Amino acid sequence: MDYIGNKWKKQVVWMLTFCGIDYCSMDSNGRVKLSPKFLEDFTSKGIDVVLHCLPEGAVAVYPEETYLKIRQEREITENRAAGSFLGRQMLRRSGAWSQSERISAQGRITLPQAFREHAGFGSGSQKMVVVGVEIGVELWTPERWNAERQRMEEHDLEKRNQEMQADLNP
């Protein structure tokens, strides 16, 4: 409670979840220890998560309930999937490159070997960048993250230039 004016009022504080960048290591068995901040974000939604390989070459980690909401929004009926190459391909990609995982008591998740290879993590211990994406986190190699960050900055600059040109030349 805070004293505001002449009354006590309860202040609602919105905490940003899954925001920021962190760095961690993955051991030779594929175990990743989450930072206390991201671990708190995940455990506030339960310890069940879904790992999902992204086309950009990273591994996303979502709370299970978040992943299920994402999938429901892109739901494909069984009939549509059976009669559609694109429908089957979408299900194949989601099915093959997603896996349930549970955060251990030590605050770790384990990446399957195929997911490590997809994201460019070699064998043995690896450094990784953990990027908050507001609905979960993404695990990147430092090299791939730097390239992705550069692409985003170039895109933002190009978009700004287009907006300025449109504004200056109506």
Each language-model region and where it sits:
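Flexible "stalk/tail and boundary" regions
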Residues: 1-24, 28-29, 37-106, 114-170
